[in-house]
Amino acid sequence: MPTFEIFSREPDLRTFRSGEAIFREGDPGDCLFAIVEGEVDIQVRGAVVDHLAAGSVFGEMALIDGLPRIATALAATDCKLAAVSEKRFLRL
């Protein structure tokens, strides 16, 4: 299934304000995200390790390995994200 189809079928769209935490290091990983609009910073121990823009996917590692989140994701700008739940991800 093409990536765009994964996020366009029954999208779970979530909005975050600039500076708002999408998830935090140590949180359980219950979904992954694709950035529809805006930008996201990925931080480890308070340091920005990646800056993501529209079209990027993040948060998948916690679904793959079943471990808590290893990073914090913060909205760098106002964002609209498409979320894919663990259940839906495992059906792909």
Summary of predicted features, one role per range:
Residues M1-R45:
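Regulatory nucleotide-sensing modules
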Residues R9, D50-L92:
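Cyclic-nucleotide recognition modules
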